[in-house]
Swiss-Prot record:
PANTHER family (alphabetical): ORGANIC SOLUTE TRANSPORTER SUBUNIT BETA (PTHR36129:SF1), ORGANIC SOLUTE TRANSPORTER SUBUNIT BETA-RELATED (PTHR36129)
Annotated GO MF terms: bile acid transmembrane transporter activity; protein heterodimerization activity
Residue ranges annotated as Cytoplasmic topological domain: 57-128
Topology with respect to the bilayer: Single-pass membrane protein
Entry protein name: Organic solute transporter subunit beta
Family: Belongs to the OST-beta family.
Tissue: Widely expressed with a high expression in ileum. Expressed in testis, colon, liver, small intestine, kidney, ovary and adrenal gland; and at low levels in heart, lung, brain, pituitary, thyroid gland, uterus, prostate, mammary gland and fat.
UniProt-listed InterPro entries: OST-beta_subunit, OSTbeta
Subunit structure: Interacts with SLC51A. The Ost-alpha/Ost-beta complex is a heterodimer composed of alpha (SLC51A) and beta (SLC51B) subunit; induces the transport of SLC51A from the endoplasmic reticulum to the plasma membrane.
GO cellular component: basolateral plasma membrane; membrane; plasma membrane; protein-containing complex
Domain notes: The transmembrane domain (TM) is the major site of interaction with SLC51A. The extracellular-membrane interface is absolutely required for transport activity. The intracellular-membrane interface is necessary for establishing the correct membrane orientation that is essential for the heterodimer Ost-alpha/Ost-beta complex formation and transport activity at the cell membrane surface.
């Protein structure tokens, strides 16, 4: 019995050429997957080892950073920071002082509004 012949239960006209059968056998071949599985396992082990090394180095760096006293700033840096703060405060004071209205005049205006609202209540607008 040849491979090109159909199976006994196949309908007529389903004859498969020998070349197609060989190609299908090669395409759907089954082989031992052990080398592939071992290579993936080795790759995963390498990734785990590298991750553990990096994690350990990160932990050690954090510990060293916590153990060291904070860096003292040089007097030049402190002087520059103070100068910046002083300049910003001066700018703020100048801005606020230049925009400060006359308080007596503001109080007088508020009192006039209150008096007018007491003597002349708002007349509700009527719709015509």
């Amino acid at each position: 019995m040849e491979h090109s012949e159909g199976a006994p239960g196949d309908p007529a006209g389903t004859v498969v050429p020998q070349e197609l059968l060989e190609e299908m056998l090669w395409f759907f071949r089954v082989e031992d997957a052990s080398p592939w599985n071992h290579s993936i396992l080795a790759l995963a082990a390498v990734v785990v080892i590298i991750s553990m090394v990096l994690l350990g180095r990160s932990i050690q760096a954090s510990r060293k950073e916590k153990m060291q006293p904070p860096e003292k700033e040089t007097p030049e840096v402190l002087h520059l920071d103070e100068a910046k703060d002083h300049n910003s405060l001066n700018n703020l004071r100048e801005t606020l002082l230049s925009e400060k209205p006359n308080l007596a005049q503001v109080e007088l205006e508020l009192k006039e509004r209150d008096v007018l609202s007491v003597f002349l209540p708002d007349v509700p607008e009527t719709e015509s």
